[in-house]
Amino acid sequence: MTLQTINPSASSHDAWESGAAAVTLTDEVKVTSGTAWAGLLAPSVTATKLATINSATLYYQASATTHDDPDLDWYAQAADTAAVFTTGASNITSRSRTTAVTQDTATSIGNSTYRSVNVTAQVAEVVARSGWVSGNNLALIGDARSGSCDLWMRSYDSGGAVWYLEIDYTEPGTGQPMAARGRQVPGMRRPHGHQG
């Protein structure tokens, strides 16, 4: 198994879009109404399209206790590789989304600990695409479900406690027990592992 932790490394790796389709890159990700959207880009995912995604988890932290009530649906972008975000109109909402979705709803999560969201199905759906290759980018898209969503999320430009994505995956032919790869020694009932 391989565990990859992916952090944003540029302002264009996270963004938010208002109900007026305006996109902001250099600020906290502010999803504060039922018409706002969040975009998070994980660059250079190392899993191949043959990998089994054991788990994928988004971790984020609210930036203020006055804006710590998430109520979002989390998708991934349905694309072989996701482009970085831009300030172009509707740059988040215009992106195709996965069938897989996770509801993320809570109140008063605070701003001192990370919240975790299971996005395993979304990541698996993208990695299984015919055009996916190791090293491609993957974007997560958060859709505010209602007007009760009031979340300011720490971003790349926040300077610390930024969001990140963890992907635990297994490639074909890896993670096999040593005994299953051993050679049979005459007179023995179980495989004898190769030494050296």
What is the meaning of each model-derived region?
Residues 55, 171-196:
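Intrinsically disordered, compositionally biased repeat/linker segments
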Residues 3-10, 126-182:
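Proprotein-processing/basic-patch segments
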Residues 15-65:
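A short beta-strand-loop element at or near the start of a globular domain
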Residues 47, 62, 121-123, 144, ...:
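Short, flexible loop/turn elements at secondary-structure junctions
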Residues 3-23, 62-134:
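Beta-strand-rich interaction/scaffold domains
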Residues 57, 62, 76-78, 144, ...:
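A mature extracytoplasmic/lumenal domain signature
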Residues 42-43, 56-58, 74, 117, ...:
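Residue-level detector of buried hydrophobic side-chain packing
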Residues 37-39, 68-70, 113, 136, ...:
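Residues that flank catalytic or metal-binding motifs in active/ligand-binding sites
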